[in-house]
Amino acid sequence: MCPQDAVVAASDESNFILNCKIAEYTKAVLQDKAHFHISFVMDVSPLCDCHPYNDAPIVPDVGIFASFDPVALDMACADAINKQCAIRNSALGEAELDLGDNLRTTNPNTDWLSAVEHGEKIGLGSKDYELIEI
């Protein structure tokens, strides 16, 4: 998970609980502070970036996203990834079934949406966004 073990899931905890904790830790860090977020949606790998090993990108580079709202930013990035066609010969391109979600298709045990939904629930931000292309 984290090379410094700052965020660790207990062996009996689900990814859902870990995702909720990540949203809560994010809120604690950002609370009452000015913040702006930038995401480079490039080289989207089938596994989390935190893995010491990975595979080829699963979709073409999507672009750069920015927002004052980290929840809206994550939602916009995930939506953009899910609108992409799979790169042939990638883990997504070779997946046997399509779950309608490029991130879950390559890693079915990860429920990325739970972090976004929990972030919205605790007041970190909103899943609603307006995409402005430049």
Q: PLM features: what roles do these ranges have?
A:
Residues M1-I134:
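Extended, low-polarity segments enriched in aliphatic/aromatic residues
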